[in-house]
Design a protein with these regions (language model features):
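Secreted/periplasmic carbohydrate-active enzymes, especially glycoside hydrolases
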Residues: 1-118, 123, 128-131, 162, ...
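Substrate-binding/catalytic cleft of secreted carbohydrate-active enzymes
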Residues: 98-104, 108-318, 327
Length: 605
């Protein structure tokens, strides 16, 4: 410890008691160095240095505990891949990956679906990453039922040996807190006996396996891709196993839109302790386009039609092959963050800071608050009162500087949107975390943007407009022209034409300049471009009816309110078993408000 000998033992087996030990965690990765010396009659023949960490892992009260604390697993699955080296990954690239994990508040990794380069575990020990260490077992192609290799006794030795190699090779790494028996191999007697072997050899760690489900031999309930409803159902049950999804929040393409909902549940239920995102990095290889000569990342069919391609399905990472952050990485960083501002009292410049860490304070973070008006920066306030906030505690902070900055912003920009952006930036003392790196951030809206209000009545009495053209009875500044095919409403600089047969805005102009031309109806849009995850679930086929659903106009009504006219179109949508009401409200200022209400048949699919 600190270069000094603190304990010694001799013999083939020995026990050393280390006084005042500093425990290892991913937040505080304190390591000791042990020297194993082999001697013979001639003297010392070999000395092996071994870094070791002291920590305890156990399961109590349906929670996974590290040193007695129910840590949250903010994890990711990581394949060994490099855009230039393929499956050969350098130490420099490994360190870069851990640096990015720290940046994104990722504290755990699952070595999917095989043991990694031994140096990876050394780095996780050194820099602080929890590891679920998985054996190289996957027989996905055989399915999960009767043909699963997990059920055939002749494959028992293979199941045991692969886990034996994994456990015996890496057992001394403190970063490894869970053993994983394999991935997607089905379930059977071979996994039950493999579990028994691992538990007999190493009583210090939990063992998990996904395919067997809750009732199988697994210490952790670790399913994959379970939705919010089923996750909450388990959390409310009397299940006695921690709930940590081994794969979830599939990060392919434009994704992570529902990440918040998972973490709302994780922070609500004690037995729900997180999960491992699928996955960390896009598995593409760097190349040049044969057409443009520009740098591209290749995959699947880029290498010909044989072997069979799964297209871009191996590119489902939080980060790109060259380790640039994909857009959804910032969503993950936010919901993984370990510090939160709560209960902002803008009038008094007061708020609470919650430290979600389990083992360290946040003295290495520097807090600032920046005030914006309509997105324009007004001022930045330094808030030094963040020292001494212990793990899992909340501190109330009051800043006069923040109070006055907010008051000044409201005084000078009262009609604009005013926001306060809090940022916790690193002081650079934590390894691999650069000085100034923002580790946590939050935005609070102090004054919402003031939109001009348009009178949008929910109901109105019908009124008859005599003749083809006339003034609104309650307001002479609104002119209405009606024919058998349309109603045209003009007010100030604007005119809008709504078709009686279409129920849509068919024409719109301002100062005589067409904004929307005839036969270019402004129609409701029920479709968006499919994402990669949509394609993976074939949702673009299942939901294709929504791209251009049939809309049959049932009725078209008009009514008059004070200073406005309301036109209401009601549609029947037989393909999707729904009714749609479009309501157009045009006021004397020439403002058009469009609202829509859809009622669906809940019994229909």
């Amino acid at each position: 410890k600190d270069g000094k000998k603190i304990a010694e033992a001799s013999g083939v087996q020995g026990t050393i008691k280390v006084p005042g030990v500093k425990a290892w965690t991913a937040e505080t990765p304190y390591l000791y160095k042990a020297f194993i010396t082999l001697k013979n009659k001639q003297g010392v023949s070999e000395v092996i240095p071994q870094k070791i960490g002291f920590r305890n892992v156990e399961i109590k009260n349906a929670q996974l505990l590290v040193n007695g604390k129910p840590v949250l697993i903010k994890g990711a699955n990581r394949h060994e891949i490099d855009p230039d080296g393929g499956y050969v990954v350098s130490v420099e690239r490994m360190i870069q990956d851990i640096k990015i994990m720290k940046q994104l508040n990722i504290n755990a990794v699952r070595t999917c679906h095989y043991p990694d380069d031994p140096r990876w575990y050394d780095l996780c020990d050194e820099y602080g990453i929890y590891v679920t260490a998985e054996a190289n077992l996957e027989s996905h192609g055989m399915g999960y039922d009767e043909k699963s290799l997990a059920k055939f006794p002749e494959y028992l030795q293979t199941h045991v040996e692969r886990n034996e190699g994994n456990v015996k090779t890496f057992i001394n790494h403190p970063s490894i807190i869970v053993w994983s028996l394999g991935n997607e191999c089905g379930y059977g007697i071979n996994f039950e006996k493999t579990y028994d072997w691992v538990k007999a050899y190493d009583q210090t760690r939990p063992v998990q396996y996904e395919r067997g489900g809750y009732d199988s031999k697994t210490d952790i309930h670790c399913p994959m891709y379970i939705d919010y409803e089923e996750s909450e159902k388990y959390c409310k049950s009397d299940g006695v196993k921690p709930y940590i999804q081994c794969e979830y929040a599939h990060a392919m393409g434009n994704s992570e839109g529902g990440f918040k909902e998972y973490w709302d549940l994780i922070r609500k239920y004690p037995k729900y302790q997180g999960g491992y995102i699928w996955d960390f990095v896009d598995q593409g290889l760097r190349d040049k386009s044969p057409v443009t000569g520009k740098e591209i990342f290749t995959y699947g069919g880029d290498y010909g039609r044989y072997p069979a391609s799964d297209y871009n399905f191996n590119c489902n990472g939080i980060i790109a092959p060259d380790r640039r952050l994909n857009p959804h990485a910032y969503e993950i960083q936010y919901w993984h963050q370990n510090v939160w501002i709560k209960d902002l009292d803008a009038v008094n410049g007061a708020f609470n800071i919650y430290n979600e860490n389990f083992f360290k304070n946040i003295d290495d973070l520097h807090l600032t608050a920046t005030i914006y008006a309509n997105g324009v920066k007004l001022s930045t306030v330094e808030i030094p009162e963040t020292k001494g906030i212990a793990p899992q505690t909340t501190k109330m902070v009051k800043s006069d500087a923040l109070k006055y900055a907010i008051a000044e912003a409201e005084s000078e920009h009262g009609k604009e949107e005013i926001t306060v952006n809090f940022a916790f930036a690193s002081d650079g003392t934590e390894p691999l975390v650069e000085k100034g790196q923002v580790m946590a951030r939050q935005q609070f809206v102090i004054n919402e943007y003031q939109f001009d209000k348009v009178d949008t009545p929910i109901a109105a009495t019908s009124t008859k407009i005599s003749g083809k053209k006339g003034k609104l009875q309650n307001n002479s500044s609104i002119e209405v022209e009606e024919t058998n095919s349309y109603v045209k409403v003009s007010a100030k600089r604007m005119s809008v034409t709504i078709g009686k047969k279409t129920g849509m805005i068919d024409y719109l102009d301002v100062d005589g300049e067409p904004i929307l031309k005839f036969r270019e109806s402004m129609k409701p849009e029920f479709w968006r471009a499919p994402t990669d995850n949509d394609y993976g679930a074939s949702l673009q086929k299942e939901l294709k009816v929504w791209k251009n659903p049939v809309m049959n106009l049932k009725s078209f009504d008009k009514s008059e309110m004070k200073d406005s006219i309301v036109l209401t179109a009601t549609f029947e949508m037989p393909e999707v078993k729904a009714e749609l009401i479009l309501r157009y409200c045009i006021n004397a200022e020439g403002e058009v408000s469009v609202t829509e209400k859809m009622t669906t048949d809940k019994a229909a699919k």
